[in-house]
Structure formats: structure tokens, C-alpha cells
Amino acid sequence: MFKRKPNPFIAYELAEMKIRTGDLMGATRNITFGIANSDGEIVRNYYETQQPYSVPMKAAFTYLKGLVKINEDRENNIDAAISILNDALAIAPNFNLAKISIDALNAQKPTIQE
């Protein structure tokens, strides 16, 4: 379906599925396509809170980019993933899922032993 008529919505779903199955290169291709082909009017809806909300697709793809980064190397890419997720928040300050992910990643950072 994506090959016949590629669009950001299908690219998002494919990228999300590929992240879950460990195909990070495939997900990156879909994310790159999505970022390049998302204008400010296309939005992604999220329902993980009581009140559903929408963010620009570019923020949604940036969020997925952060997930790819952390899945590449969970120990060494925490700061890089947080930086990417902060980019998503800069695009959409109301992006609750990005905020939750940043908090979870900050909690995974090793504490400095004295």
C-alpha cells in the first residue's frame, strides 16, 4: 500500500511497527520520508491521556526518531535520545508522550557513585 501511494500516515504506522519488530533501518527510512513529506497542517492524534490531543506529524516522526536512537543502544544513547525527544517537544510543547518518554529515560540514567 505504501509503495502504491506513499503518505506520512502510512509511513508513521510502518515506522512504528518496524521499531517494535527491531527493523531500525526500515523504520529510519519511513521516518526520513515522513519528516520530508509532513507539512504543518498534517497532525497525528494521541489517546494515551483522558483528553486526546494532536501534534504536527513532524513532531510525531521526531518522537519515533528518538525511539530508534534509544533502541540502537540503550546504554549509550540515552542523552542523544533525550535530545531528539526535546526537539519533538520544541515542535509540539503539548506532546505528552514525548514528555513521559524523556522522564523515563532520565530515570534510566546511571547515578554517579561517590
Residues of each region from the PLM?
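TPR alpha-solenoid repeat register
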Residues: 10, 43-44, 61, 98
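Flexible helix-coil transition and linker loops at the boundaries of alpha-helical arrays
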Residues: 1-4, 37-55
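Structural motif corresponding to the intra-repeat A-B loop/turn of tetratricopeptide repeats
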Residues: 21, 72-75, 109
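Residue-level recognition of tetratricopeptide repeat
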Residues: 7-8, 16, 41, 58, 67-70, 94-95, 104
